[in-house]
A protein has these predicted regions:
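Short, flexible, solvent-exposed loop/turn segments with mixed acidic/basic and small polar residues
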Residues: 80-82, 189-196, 313-316, 410-414
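M16 family metallopeptidases and their MPP-like homologs
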Residues: 17, 23-36, 41, 60-116, ...
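Soluble acyl-CoA-dependent acyltransferase catalytic core bearing the H(X)4D motif
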Residues: 145-155
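Acidic/histidine-enriched alpha-helical segments
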Residues: 64, 120-144, 231-245, 342, ...
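Short, polar/flexible loop-turn hinges at active-site or ligand-entry regions and domain interfaces
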Residues: 53-56, 98-101, 120-129
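Active-site glycine-rich loop that binds ribose-phosphate moieties when present
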Residues: 182-189
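His/Glu-rich zincin catalytic helix
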Residues: 1-71, 176, 189-300, 420-435
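Short, low-order "capping/linker" segments at domain edges
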Residues: 142-146, 247-261, 366-376
Length: 435
């Protein structure tokens, strides 16, 4: 794999990933902006609205026909919340020219279509087409309501909302239903223009192609030429910037809903410590504690004590948090919470073996190796490094993991504190709303 990063202009970056291992090309436009309550719902609507039509292809059927002409390429868009930033993403997967009956510059046509959709939307009188806006407002309302139907996602997001009620990370990436009443085709287009002029834009092209040809195409594309330079407005979230404060008592929130299985989410803070680069120690700690079938959560909470149907933990490097997530019988709440506290103390006491460490390293390194096996995973990894301002090659990543010691993990465990315990239990029908 060869990776080239090129600044087209301030705030607009081209990333070329040249790899001969895949039969497809993957082309992505990421637009990143800070998470802010005022515009969160408008932001969520924009990808859905602009995929309905551009000036050249003024409805979704025409876009779809063009995509089909490109040997069955696939186009989609979406949203990601990364730390205190929101990422609007637009991507096309297409067959590489080398695997077509005859070479016809398929990738170049794909890129032209992608840039047309993102940067040249269908506009009427300085407004998006009203029909598309109203359609997508209804779809977004359904999507927001559907989050409550998936209790795993709902409980996890609710815990984050409680912990980060006063910051962008606590916002739902889909916004809220109340905002939809005030959104119209004109103010939504105004917000789109603001995002295009201020957001961080990253164009990533992965596949087997001629570097110079793609560079030239992007540089000479009129939509890209029309983009202005912009200042960096993103929030920088990484293990260095997210400094947690010590708290005396964790917050406990219990919510009742019509559920058959309780959902327990525990948010942990990573306090400042003397370890120089504890990301990799945190990854090891999290894996030993709760990420994988050999972890303490899985082996003890789920298998040995039969307290949980599901039990896992996740390290969120952007926010210096670890989240424990369990699906349990509601009457087993107290036992489960107490056992989890015991396991956290065991980690502080170094009650894990060198065999645990070695198995965990193998597990993590296997995951790192898989990053370069899928184009989308590789793209997301590289883009994550871009946002965090902490570039890290996968080989260096593996070496850092190999170097972690038991003493470091035990020392790191001292910096873990309980922040929030959230429990969704049976007993009610309606969930509380949050923004």
């Amino acid at each position: 794999m060869k990776y080239i990063k090129q600044n087209i202009k301030d705030g607009v970056t081209l990333h070329l990933i040249i790899n001969e291992n895949f039969k497809t090309d993957f082309s992505v436009v990421f637009i990143s902006i800070p998470l802010e309550k005022e515009d969160i719902t408008k932001n969520a609507l924009i990808p859905a609205v602009i995929k309905n039509g551009s000036k050249k292809y003024n409805n979704y059927q025409l876009i779809n026909e063009e995509i089909e002409m490109l040997y069955g390429a696939s186009f989609d868009c979406g949203l990601d919340k990364t730390g205190d930033n929101l990422v609007l993403k637009f991507y096309v997967e297409s067959i590489n020219d080398n695997f077509l009956p005859e070479k016809n510059e398929n990738l170049e046509q794909v890129l032209n279509l992608l840039l047309e959709i993102v940067f040249n939307p269908l506009v009427e009188n300085e407004s998006f087409k009203n029909q598309y806006v109203e359609l997508e407002k209804k779809n977004l309302e359904l999507l927001i309501n559907s989050v409550k139907d998936d209790k795993d996602i709902y409980s996890y997001e609710k815990c984050i909302n409680i912990m980060y009620k006063n910051s962008g990370y606590g916002l739902s990436k889909y916004g809220n239903i109340e905002d939809l009443k005030t959104i119209n085709s004109k103010n939504l287009y105004s917000r789109y223009k603001e995002i295009i002029s201020k957001g961080k834009i990253d164009i990533i092209v992965s596949g087997n192609y001629e570097k110079e040809k793609i560079q030239r195409q992007i540089e000479e594309n009129q939509f890209i030429k029309n983009l202005n330079s912009r200042e960096d407005i993103l929030n920088i979230n990484n293990f260095k910037t997210e400094l947690k404060e010590k708290i005396d008592n964790p917050e406990t929130v219990k919510e009742e809903m019509d559920v058959t299985q309780g959902k327990l989410v525990i948010g942990l803070d990573i306090l400042p410590n003397n370890l120089e680069d504890f990301r990799f120690i945190a990854i090891m700690y999290n894996a030993i504690f709760g990420n994988g079938v050999n972890s303490k959560l899985f082996q003890i909470v789920r298998e040995k004590e039969s307290l949980a149907y599901t039990a896992k933990s996740e390290y969120v490097v952007q926010k210096n948090n670890i989240f424990i997530r369990c699906g349990i019988e509601c009457e087993k709440y107290d036992k489960t919470v107490e056992l989890i506290k015991v396991l956290l103390e065991q980690m502080k006491n170094g009650e894990f073996t060198e065999e645990d460490i070695n198995k965990t390293k193998e597990y993590i390194i296997s995951g790192i190796d898989s990053i370069n096996e899928e184009q989308d995973t590789q793209i997301l990894y590289l883009f994550g490094q871009e946002l965090s301002k902490l570039p890290l090659k996968t080989e260096e990543y593996k070496e850092k993991i190999k170097a972690v010691t038991k003493e470091q993990i035990t020392e790191f465990a001292q910096s873990i504190q309980l922040n929030t315990i959230y429990f969704l239990k049976s007993g009610g029908e309606n969930a509380d709303n949050w923004e």
